[in-house]
């Protein structure tokens, strides 16, 4: 491989890692006890920063002779071109042999094919918490609203049986239970909670 190009919509590479603050043992252990308004505010602030690449990872990538970082370069279009593709950004067209996409995280159970039979029954944060006017966050609102043991909760109590035995021990637990199943540093508190659940 002669070249690797990384495109970011942002004009600057994130430099603040909000996870460092959230990894403190007291925070990871006590986060689930916070009220919904506090959880919502904390996660809105967290998600507003994004996470930078690790220094080691970035240094190794940048040392690669064919590495190129394109900041402020959202993809405006992608079209086939022979055996490859052309990506157009505000800086112009770029031709590639192949594309690898990593476009962010959306934790909406409705997007998961394995949950298609019950997705409409799963409670989301939008169903359980109304943030103050002007502070709604669609990314947070789409997350499942989980019980204390990572269990999926129903929008309607009549649907509880349909969700029995379904747990979200993954990144989608972030809003309800904090850095639990979404980071190695959270497993110390998360695994016992999952087992008890």
Question: PLM features: residue spans?
Answer:
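Flavin (primarily FAD) cofactor-binding/catalytic cores of flavoenzymes
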Residues: 3-197
């Amino acid at each position: 491989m002669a070249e690797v190009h990384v495109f970011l919509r942002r004009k600057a590479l994130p430099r603040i890692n909000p996870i460092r603050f959230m990894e403190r043992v007291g925070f990871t252990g006590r986060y689930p006890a916070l009220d919904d308004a506090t959880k919502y505010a904390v996660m809105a602030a967290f998600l507003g920063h994004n996470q930078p690449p690790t220094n080691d990872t970035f240094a190794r990538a940048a040392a690669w002779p064919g590495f190129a970082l394109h900041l402020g370069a959202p993809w405006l279009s992608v079209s086939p071109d022979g055996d490859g593709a052309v990506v157009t950004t505000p800086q112009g067209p770029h031709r590639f042999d192949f594309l690898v996409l990593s476009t962010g995280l959306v934790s909406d159970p409705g997007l998961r094919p394995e949950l298609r039979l019950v997705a409409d029954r799963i409670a989301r944060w939008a169903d359980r918490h109304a943030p103050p006017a002007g502070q709604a966050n669609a990314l947070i609102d789409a997350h499942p609203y989980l019980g204390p043991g990572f269990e999926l909760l129903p929008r309607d109590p009549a649907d509880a049986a349909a969700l029995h035995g379904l747990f979200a021990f993954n990144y989608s637990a972030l809003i309800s239970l904090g850095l639990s199943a979404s980071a190695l540093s959270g497993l110390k508190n998360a695994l016992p909670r999952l087992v008890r659940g």
